[in-house]
Curated annotation (Swiss-Prot):
Protein name in UniProt: Photosystem I reaction center subunit II-2, chloroplastic
Matches recorded under InterPro entries: PsaD, PsaD_sf
Subunit details: Interacts with CURT1C.
Its membrane topology: Peripheral membrane protein
GO cellular-component term (any): extracellular region
KW Hydrolase (keyword) present: no
UniProt keyword list: Chloroplast, Membrane, Phosphoprotein, Photosynthesis, Photosystem I, Plastid, Thylakoid, Transit peptide
Stretches for region Disordered: 47-71
Modified residues (Phosphothreonine): 47
Signal peptide coordinates: none
Organism of derivation: Arabidopsis thaliana
């Protein structure tokens, strides 16, 4: 499931619209006062501590995780996402991708509004929660499916969500529930009966 994608750290995205240059979406610099935007690429420093990526769980049988294309264009955004955190250079950052049926405006999870391109879009974010927030908005308002990945400093890519190809709020045959009890909360034993036993009422 983990693949090498060294080009993800410096995707060559050079697109112009209405004679105004786009700001590189992941620039760590502040927004300039003029309309001439600069673009910078974040290159992660390979360290010994980050060379050993955590163990990656295999995908369920019958599901093939989609491959990440680092050349996918980014949404049009004449602002800044605040840059990636320092941990992106020593630990990881996150990439969310989706396909849009048309060019339309959407709200960025970091604040502000951007224009998603018609077709594939790719957005780098510092935190997984930002990907989840944007993905929820894409599905609820725009009816667009999405995927997001974790990218390590050595270029290794780990597919994260949806893990088995089906979003967690939908039923998926064969998916095992975690901590599932087929009873209502009122049928749990009294908490006083399990006090000092090291167990919880939902464990019985």
């Amino acid at each position: 499931m983990a693949t090498q994608a060294a080009g993800i750290f410096s995707p060559a995205i050079t697109t112009t619209t209405s004679a105004v240059k786009k700001l590189h979406l992941f620039s760590s610099s502040h927004r300039p006062k003029s309309l001439s935007f600069t673009k910078t690429a974040i290159r992660a420093e390979k360290t010994e501590s980050s060379s050993a990526a955590p163990a990656v769980k295999e995908a369920p049988v019958g599901f093939t995780p989609p491959q990440l294309d680092p050349n996918t264009p980014s949404p049009i955004f004449a602002g800044s996402t605040g840059g990636l955190l320092r941990k992106a250079q020593v630990e990881e950052f996150y990439v969310i991708t989706w396909n849009s049926p048309k060019e339309q405006i959407f709200e960025m999870p970091t604040g502000g509004a951007a224009i998603m391109r018609e077709g594939p879009n790719l957005l780098k974010l510092a935190r997984k929660e930002q990907c989840l927030a944007l993905g929820t908005r894409l599905r609820s308002k725009y009816k667009i499916t999405y995927q997001f990945y974790r990218v390590f400093p050595n270029g290794e890519v780990q597919y994260l969500h949806p893990k088995d190809g089906v979003y967690p709020e939908k039923a998926n045959p064969g998916r095992e529930g975690v901590g599932l009890n087929m009873r209502s909360i009122g049928k749990n034993v009294s908490p006083i009966e399990v006090k000092f036993t090291g167990k919880q009422s939902y464990d019985l």
